[in-house]
């Protein structure tokens, strides 16, 4: 069985801003999945949505009534236990992602790929609830993104001292 990454574009703003958005998303998801041999044969659905859709998902499933950059919904706690082979779904909000990228001085493409990697790691059981877990997750994100030629998303911006 082969691994699948299904990308659903609900908000065309994604393709207007990044014409190669599907390739960017697939590349980031695949980079994480390639580093985890134990999940071969499982699939992920990635929804590129608008802020309203992500706000609805966040409200309905997490009881938080606001749009957020990325949501991850694992299918089960152990991917091997899922008979259909899906490890979960990810949803990304265009407006939130675009604003964050601009605020952080990053390209939308790089920010999107970081958030996809972050979301896939959540599906695989990574978390950032405490400092040790956050450090481990961020280290893995840095490693994955470096392989995609994306700068460290957690690096402090260079100061403009003069």
From Swiss-Prot:
GO CC annotations on file: cytoplasm
Chief location: cytoplasm
Annotated SUPFAM superfamilies: Metalloproteases ('zincins'), catalytic domain
Gene Ontology BP annotations: rRNA processing
Cofactor: record remark: Binds 1 zinc ion.
EC number(s) given by UniProt: 3.1.-.-
Keywords for this protein: Cytoplasm, Endonuclease, Hydrolase, Metal-binding, Nuclease, Ribosome biogenesis, rRNA processing, Zinc
Binding site for Zn(2+): 118, 122, 128
Cofactor: Zn(2+)
Cell compartments where the protein resides: Cytoplasm
A Pfam family the protein falls into: YbeY
Family: Belongs to the endoribonuclease YbeY family.
Biological function: Single strand-specific metallo-endoribonuclease involved in late-stage 70S ribosome quality control and in maturation of the 3' terminus of the 16S rRNA.
Name used for this protein in its record: Endoribonuclease YbeY
UniProt source species: Caulobacter sp. (strain K31)
